């Protein structure tokens, strides 16, 4: 949440200048990774606008492909899944969303096989809705019971992915206790564009 240190950015620029020229987005990603490393970060969570940018992050222990659906630009879900599969790396673990369309899952399985990446798919049968209120819910996934700031199966699927990503990191040698997983999920806030203006009567603003 803080701006990167200018001195770190300068050193990152010098390090980049010593290597082959990269496209702008790739160079920015490498510079950010350098700054995270210099700041002493063990792990960084990076959301890629283009899965192809993963090529400049060859040492990702885990990665994720969230739910894939129509994008409104006439590209098929198969094509979108194939593009998303570009995030996978050799000997990494990729976690994807439960209940992906069959066509999407097929593309991801092929992509994982091609680059020797393990694909983990949370079992939707392991997701149990314990209770739901007007604006929140409580679910259990594989023994991890957490309150969610969102309603619906989509949010529960994302929570299952988060659990599987944490467990994948544990398999890669990172020590993440169950309590930390539960605390992390419980701390998630709903910062979407949807705002509840009034509860009685219920008025919701969707920006």
Language-model-derived ranges and their functions:
Residues 1-61, 70, 74:
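ATP-dependent carboxylate-amine ligase catalytic core
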Residues 96-100, 111-133, 149-153, 175-187, ...:
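Beta-strand->loop->alpha-helix junctions that form or flank phosphate-binding loops
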Residues 19-30, 41, 87, 92-104, ...:
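Phosphate/pyrophosphate-binding catalytic cores of soluble transferases and nucleic-acid-acting enzymes
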Residues 28, 42-44, 61-63, 92-95, ...:
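Structural motif
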Residues 43-44, 48, 52-64, 68-72, ...:
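Nucleotide phosphate-binding/pyrophosphate-handling subdomain across enzymes
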């Amino acid at each position: 949440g803080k701006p990167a240190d200018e001195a770190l950015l300068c050193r990152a620029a010098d390090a980049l200048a010593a290597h082959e020229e990269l496209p702008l987005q790739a160079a920015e990603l490498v510079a950010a990774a350098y700054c995270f490393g210099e700041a002493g970060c063990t792990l960084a969570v990076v959301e890629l606008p283009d899965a192809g940018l993963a090529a400049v992050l060859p040492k990702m222990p885990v990665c994720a492909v969230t739910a894939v659906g129509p994008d409104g630009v006439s590209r098929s879900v198969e094509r979108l899944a194939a593009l998303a599969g570009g995030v996978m790396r050799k000997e990494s673990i990729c976690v994807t969303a439960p209940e992906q369309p069959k066509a999407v899952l097929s593309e991801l399985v092929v992509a994982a096989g091609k680059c020797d990446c393990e694909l983990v798919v949370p079992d939707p049968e392991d997701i149990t809705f314990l209770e739901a209120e007007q604006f929140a819910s409580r679910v259990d996934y594989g023994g991890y019971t957490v309150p969610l700031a969102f309603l619906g199966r989509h949010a529960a699927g994302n929570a299952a992915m988060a659990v599987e990503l944490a467990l994948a990191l544990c398999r890669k040698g990172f020590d993440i206790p169950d309590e930390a997983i539960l605390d992390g999920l419980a701390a998630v806030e709903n910062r979407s564009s949807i705002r509840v203006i009034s509860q009685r009567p219920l008025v919701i603003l969707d920006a």
